């Protein structure tokens, strides 16, 4: 039971980090989190409980590392509120993936210009 409580607290902290400047979304995320806990409160088998705890921990990790809130500025651009735990990639995997996609990769139309054009 302590692992469930620990995962729940961890998820609550994750919602606070991810949605700290957006109170309606923070409240909605916490309502969703509580509902998920209630829905799984009837689990009896230890493997099912461990799987649910692992899933909750993964959700918390995803929220902290991958969710970035943005604010639209007066000039129409968005200011992104990154924090110290935000996962920042180097785009190398994206470049590799595009090369490996072969014929599935989209073709650039004549009306679409890239930064290199």
Swiss-Prot record:
GO cellular component, as recorded: mitochondrial matrix
Compartments, as annotated in UniProt: Mitochondrion matrix
UniProt keyword Kinase present: no
InterPro entries according to UniProt: Complex1_LYR_LYRM7 (IPR045298), MZM1/LYRM7 (IPR050435)
Subunit structure: Interacts with RIP1.
Homology family: Belongs to the complex I LYR family. MZM1 subfamily.
Name the UniProt record assigns to this protein: Mitochondrial zinc maintenance protein 1, mitochondrial
């Amino acid at each position: 039971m302590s692992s469930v409580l620990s995962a729940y607290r961890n998820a609550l902290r994750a919602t606070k980090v991810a949605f700290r400047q957006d109170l309606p979304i923070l409240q909605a995320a916490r309502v969703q989190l509580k509902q998920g806990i209630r829905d799984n409160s009837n689990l009896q088998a230890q493997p099912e409980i461990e799987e649910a705890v692992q899933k909750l921990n993964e959700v918390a990790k995803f929220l902290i590392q991958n969710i970035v809130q943005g604010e639209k500025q007066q000039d129409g651009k968005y200011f992104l509120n990154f924090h110290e735990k935000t996962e920042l990639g180097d785009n190398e995997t994206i470049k590799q993936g595009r090369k490996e996609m072969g014929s599935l990769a989209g073709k650039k139309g004549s009306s679409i210009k890239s930064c290199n054009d």
